[in-house]
Regions:
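Catalytic pocket-lining loop regions of alpha/beta-barrel enzymes
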Residues: 153-271, 314, 320-325
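Mid-domain alpha/beta scaffold segments of enzyme catalytic cores
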Residues: 35-169, 175, 179, 223, ...
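Active-site metal-binding loops of divalent metal-dependent hydrolases
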Residues: 48, 94, 202, 275-276
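Short helix-capping segments at alpha-helix termini
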Residues: 110-113, 139, 191-196, 226-227, ...
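Mid-to-C-terminal alpha-helical segments outside catalytic/metal-binding sites
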Residues: 3-6, 13-28, 35-46, 67-88, ...
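Short, small-residue-enriched loops and turns at beta-alpha junctions
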Residues: 96-97, 124-125, 150-154, 205-208, ...
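Short aromatic-enriched loop/helix-cap "lid" or pocket-rim segments at secondary-structure transitions
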Residues: 54-59, 102, 130-131, 210-212, ...
Length: 326
C-alpha cells in the first residue's frame, strides 16, 4: 500500500489491532482482513441523519411510535461501537421544513465533527434562488438532496436552471431514488457537466443471492461514464433486509453488487456513507462498516483513503475544521 500526500502513517497487523481495540470490542472484528489499514485513516461518514422530535416544531420524519423516533445527534454517532473510528460526518437532510436546514447549521457551528451539510430545498419554486443564496453563504452548506422523480420531471420539462444554479454556487446534488436512478442521472450529467452529482445508496437496488439485476447494472455503467457523478455506498445492509430478517454479515453476499459499482466508478468516485440511524434497523454500525471497508481494503493502493474521505472531499468539498480529530 503506497504512502499518501496526507502523510498517513501505516502500521502492521498487530499495531492496527491494538490501535482499534475500542472499536472492535464486542464486534468480533479483531481478525479482519483490513487489519493493515493506516492508523491515521480519516473516515468521513457522508450519510447521517440528525433530528430532535422534542423541538417545538416537531419533525415530519421519522414517524412517532417507531424506534427511530427519538433525539439523534452527532454525539450519539460518536458513541457507537465502530469498526474504525469515524472522524467526521456530512449530514444529509431528514426534513422538509425549510428552517431545519438552519437548525443543522446551528448544530454544526460548535461541533467540528460536522464537516458539511446536504440540505433540502425545492427546485422549480420561486423561492429557490434566494434560499440557495441564503444557505450557501455558510461554507458548511455543501448541497441539497432531491428525489430521482424530481430530476426526471425537470429533465422532461427541460427546466434545469435551478440545478445549474447549484453548480454555479459550487454546491453538490444528492439524488435518492430506486434502481432506475443511475440511468436518470446519466442523462442529467450530460446536460450539466459542471454539476457534482452524488447517487445515494447505490440506487437502492434490492440485494439478493440471485445477483445484480441487469437494468440496474447497465444504469450504473451509464452513470459512471460521466465523471461528475459519484456513487455513495450507503444503505447497503438495508438493501439486503427482507421480511424483518437481519441481512447477511458476510462480504461475499454483497460482493457482486460492490463489484458492479467499483468496476464502473473506479476507486476515484466511490464514497462511504452509513445512512445511520436508519441503518440500525438492519445491522449494527460496526457491521456495515466492516463489510464495505473489507472490500475497499482488498483493492489495495490508496483505495481505503479515497473511499473513506478523499473522494467525498472532491464531491462535496467538505470543510476541514480545527479540532475535528481531537
Amino acid at each position: 500500500m503506497k504512502a499518501l500526500d496526507l502523510g498517513v502513517l501505516f502500521m502492521n497487523r498487530r499495531n492496527w489491532i491494538a490501535g482499534s481495540i475500542t472499536g472492535l470490542v464486542g464486534l468480533g472484528h479483531a481478525n479482519s482482513k483490513a487489519s493493515s489499514a493506516p492508523l491515521g485513516l480519516d473516515i468521513i461518514d457522508c450519510h447521517t441523519h440528525f433530528y430532535d422530535p422534542m423541538r417545538p416544531e416537531g419533525i415530519p420524519w421519522p414517524e412517532k411510535g417507531t424506534s427511530l423516533y427519538r433525539t439523534v445527534l452527532p454525539k450519539d454517532l460518536r458513541a457507537l461501537k465502530q469498526f474504525r473510528p469515524v472522524t467526521g460526518t456530512v449530514i444529509v437532510e431528514a426534513s422538509s421544513h425549510l428552517e431545519d436546514n438552519q437548525w443543522l447549521l446551528d448544530i454544526a457551528k460548535d461541533d467540528p465533527f460536522i464537516v458539511g451539510i446536504v440540505g433540502r430545498l425545492e427546485p422549480a419554486t420561486k423561492e429557490f434562488g434566494n434560499q440557495v443564496k441564503r444557505f450557501a453563504a455558510n461554507p458548511l452548506f455543501r448541497g441539497i438532496r432531491v428525489s430521482s422523480d424530481l430530476v426526471a420531471d425537470l429533465l422532461e420539462k427541460g427546466t434545469l436552471g435551478d440545478l445549474k444554479l447549484l453548480a454555479d454556487s459550487d454546491l453538490a446534488l444528492d439524488v435518492n431514488g430506486g434502481p432506475e436512478t443511475p440511468a436518470i442521472l446519466a442523462k442529467l450529467a450530460k446536460k450539466l457537466p459542471s454539476l457534482r452529482i452524488v447517487l445515494n445508496h447505490i440506487g437502492n437496488v434490492r440485494i439478493t443471492s440471485e445477483g445484480p439485476p441487469l437494468a440496474w447494472r447497465e444504469g450504473i455503467q451509464k452513470a459512471a461514464l460521466n465523471k461528475n457523478i459519484f456513487c455513495k455506498v450507503s444503505a447497503l445492509v438495508e438493501g439486503a433486509t427482507r421480511d424483518g430478517k437481519r441481512p447477511p454479515k458476510d462480504l461475499a453476499f454483497y460482493r457482486p453488487y460492490l463489484n458492479v459499482v467499483w468496476n464502473a466508478f473506479g476507486y476515484e468516485r466511490v464514497i462511504y456513507g452509513s445512512n445511520w440511524p436508519v441503518s440500525e434497523l438492519a445491522a449494527a454500525y460496526g457491521t456495515l462498516q466492516q463489510i464495505v471497508m473489507e472490500y475497499a481494503f482488498e483493492k489495495g493502493g490508496n483505495t481505503m483513503e479515497r473511499f473513506c474521505s478523499l473522494n467525498a472531499k472532491q464531491a462535496y468539498k467538505w470543510v476541514e475544521r480545527p479540532g475535528r480529530r481531537g
